[in-house]
Amino acid sequence: MPHPVDMVVDTGDKGDLWMDAIEAEKRGDREDSLRICRELVIGEPDNSDAWMMIARMELPAPTKGKQEMPSLVQTAKSVTALKKVVQLDPENRRAWDLGGTLLVDHLGMMEDALTWWEERREHAPAEVTPLIEQVSILVRMGYYEECADLIEEMFSPEMETVDGGLRMRMGRVSQTVSKASK
């Protein structure tokens, strides 16, 4: 068993690694930040923040405010890290949103994306976003009839209150399904 002093130093080293990763990101050195976070999760596999940084650093850096399209390899690596993030921190909405976007828009994995959002619903049953995403995916797949139950649930009183923008999106999704199913 390690000496208690060694354990304290160990914790400090991990904290130092995390600070180094943040500093590398601030400097714009994504590769160094990625390398440090990979090293960090080897010793601290339950560090959801480090996994989230890995997921972000695997993707191309935005240039002039626009996100460059990631390669399949970059996307797959990012999704793998995001799966770890949501496993460790199921309340990390940013990870859920990014993972859903990557699965649908960059990998075209519609079935996996449906499962992804269903898992989110298990953790946040009153959240509307997973339902909207599932309906949108089903519409893209042409499964309009399957959308009806989800839309009904989306507008049920048990669901969280949403802001105007999300309410408009819910209405658009509902209208799209209604028109397409006729």
Which residues fall in each region the model found?
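Residue-level recognition of tetratricopeptide repeat
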Residues: I22, R56, T63, T101-L102, ...
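TPR-adjacent "capping" and linker segments in tetratricopeptide-repeat scaffold/adaptor proteins
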Residues: P2-D16
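Structural signature of tandem alpha-helical TPR/SEL1-like repeats
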Residues: R27-R35, P62-K84, H106-E119, G142-D149
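TPR alpha-solenoid repeat register
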Residues: A50, A95, P130, D163-G164
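Canonical positions in the second alpha-helix
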Residues: E39-L40, K84-V85, E119-R120, M154
